[in-house]
Curated annotation (Swiss-Prot):
GO terms for biological process: fumarate metabolic process. Keywords: Cell inner membrane, Cell membrane, Membrane, Transmembrane, Transmembrane helix. Its main location: membrane. Belongs to the FrdD family. InterPro entries: Fumarate_red_D, SQR/QFR_C/D. The keyword Transferase does not apply. Two distinct, membrane-bound, FAD-containing enzymes are responsible for the catalysis of fumarate and succinate interconversion; fumarate reductase is used in anaerobic growth, and succinate dehydrogenase is used in aerobic growth. Anchors the catalytic components of the fumarate reductase complex to the cell inner membrane, binds quinones. This is Fumarate reductase subunit D. The lineage of its organism: Bacteria, Pseudomonadati, Pseudomonadota, Gammaproteobacteria, Enterobacterales. It comes from Klebsiella pneumoniae subsp. pneumoniae (strain ATCC 700721 / MGH 78578).
């Protein structure tokens, strides 16, 4: 018989954050590494485009703060989701693993939000 009151799963929320973090890490993060780690040090990017004043103005704008927040938080959720499922696959039992890994991701997300908003 079909259960008339099925238990709702919270897994789609975590899979959504995992997918968003993986996509961000695959598309946006390599561009930032190329730009900040290769093009700027080699002098291949216009120097005035990435002056301290312009970068600071961007980082203090709403869009800049959102970008910095997403640059930190989405890969964080992706990584902790991967670690959570890797522990399961390796048959390493972490007591309350869902609370440990997703709770850590949530706590670090709040810390990042506070840091991005107030610093």
């Amino acid at each position: 018989m079909i259960n008339p009151n099925p238990k709702r799963s919270d897994e789609p929320v975590f899979w959504g954050l995992f997918g968003a973090g993986g996509m961000w890490g695959a598309i946006v993060a390599p561009v930032m590494v190329l730009l900040v780690g290769i093009l700027l040090p080699l002098g291949l990017a216009p120097a005035d485009a990435f002056s301290y004043e312009r970068v600071l103005a961007f980082a203090q704008s709403f869009i800049g703060r959102a970008f910095i927040f997403l640059m930190i938080v989405l890969p964080l959720w992706c990584g902790l989701h991967r670690i959570h499922h890797a522990m399961h696959d390796l048959k390493i039992h972490v007591p309350n693993g869902k609370w440990v890994f997703y709770g850590l991701a949530a706590i670090l997300s709040v810390i990042t939000l506070v840091g991005v908003l107030f610093i």
